[in-house]
Amino acid sequence: MSADTAVVRGAPAAGDETWIVACLCAQWCGICRAWHDAFRALAAEGLLPGARWLWVDIEQQADALGDFEPENFPVLAVQRGERLLYCATLPQQSANWRRMIEAVGALDEAQARRWAQTLGEHAPDLRVLRDDLPG
């Protein structure tokens, strides 16, 4: 599976259960820039088959992110369909990100509902974001 994605246009489709794994970062952040290749390598592993992997510069997509403002970078965000299941800063170590992505991917329906509820209503909807650094 390619880590590259196309620009998403318009409103998300109802009933879409596509996985989205995003790294929310900022172009000015040196840590984020250094993390880019490792994030792309994780995408190439196919941890969540069929998932869209996005590298998101929060300043370039501020309008789409609404009120969401991370306290630190980089942020791992994982969403399935309309449910954002995980959105938090993690140390930029591939093993940590891999374990979290695998854990989120293994959630059953009831667990996913509980995880999504803990994030609240101001969480971003990853379905409206685009990949800022393809490849």
What are these regions (language model features)?
Residues 24, 43, 48-64, 70-72, ...:
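Thiol-based oxidoreductase modules, predominantly thioredoxin-like and allied folds used
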